[in-house]
Structures are given as C-alpha cells and as structure tokens.
Amino acid sequence: MADEFLVVGQVVAAQGLKGEVRILPASDFPQRFTEPGSRWLRRRGHNEQQVQLLSGRQLPGKELFVVRFEGINDRTAAESLVHQEFLVAADDIPELEDGEFHVRDLQGLSVRLDTESDPIGVVVDLHHGGNDLLEIELKADGRRCLVPFVDAIVPQVELEEGWLLITPPKGLLDG
C-alpha cells in the first residue's frame, strides 16, 4: 500500500565489499539513515520489502549515507539493491521546529500574492538544496517555476487554511 510508506531516499550504489550501500536522501532527517530499525525497500512496480537497518553514517562532505542491512553481506547482494527506493512507515514523522514543514503538507497548497487575492498557482513539490525551492504550477498558463523557500519570499504559510503567501522579486515568475 503506497500510502503506508514515505520515500526518503534511493539506493544509488554498492559501497565496498561487505554489503554496504550508498543512499541518496530525500529527507532532512538523518536519523532515518543512521538509527537501527525497520525500513523498507521497493523496486519500481514491485511491493515493499522490509529490511533491518543495522547501521548508517553520512559520507563526509557529501549528501550520501552509507548503510548496512541485515542479511546483505557482500557486494553482489548490495548491488542487487541499487535503484530501489528507501522507505519509512508513513507514521514515522519526526517532530518539527517552528517554521519547518513536511513536503507532503506543502504539496497542494494554493499560492497567493497577498492575503486577499485569488490563488495564482499551487505547490506541486519541494526541492532540497542549499536553499529549498518550492515548485509552483501557475494557474494562468500551467507553467512551473521554482521559488526559493525563504522567509523573505515566502513570509506566510497557512497549513490549516491551505495556502501560502509569496512576495517574489520582479521577474521570478516571468517566463
């Protein structure tokens, strides 16, 4: 059941000879890759397979984690996991600080230029990086644009009401 799980990363390569794999994270919560416990792997078009995470560490200077799973003890076994999605249970939601949001809470929010106006678009995704970027689909022409998710440009997020306010600099939304 797809809605029972959250995709938090992807296995991108085997690491060494002892069965470790590299995971590219799609989550801001490193404990999902370092704390032992149940996780799931899923190859596209297949069902989830439960695995036990034994250990994990972040590669210094990289946005990659190296993890070890129970029963994966050599490079051949590790290579068989490449391209699989790394999942956690959907109810495994870490506590957030004020001003932090889960991607799934932002997706679908209406985007407004002021608190009284009609929406100009909808949030379709959040891209992580040096600064997170909201991907917004504009109502006027269906175009998608990226908006820096920083207080100066997105000063207000109203999850309960289903919208957020943006104050884009001139040209940011232009085609």
UniProtKB/Swiss-Prot annotation:
Pfam families: PRC_RimM (PF24986), RimM (PF01782). InterPro entries: PRC_barrel-like_sf (IPR011033), PRC_RimM (IPR056792), RimM (IPR011961), RimM_N (IPR002676), RimM_N_sf (IPR036976), Transl_B-barrel_sf (IPR009000). GO terms for biological process: ribosomal small subunit biogenesis; rRNA processing. Keywords: Chaperone, Cytoplasm, Ribosome biogenesis, rRNA processing. It comes from the Bacteria. Residues 98-172 form the PRC barrel domain. Belongs to the RimM family. An accessory protein needed during the final step in the assembly of 30S ribosomal subunit, possibly for assembly of the head region. Essential for efficient processing of 16S rRNA. May be needed both before and after RbfA during the maturation of 16S rRNA. It has affinity for free ribosomal 30S subunits but not for 70S ribosomes. Binds ribosomal protein uS19. The PRC barrel domain binds ribosomal protein uS19. This is Ribosome maturation factor RimM. It comes from Synechococcus sp. (strain RCC307). The lineage of its organism: Bacteria, Bacillati, Cyanobacteriota, Cyanophyceae, Synechococcales. The gene is rimM.
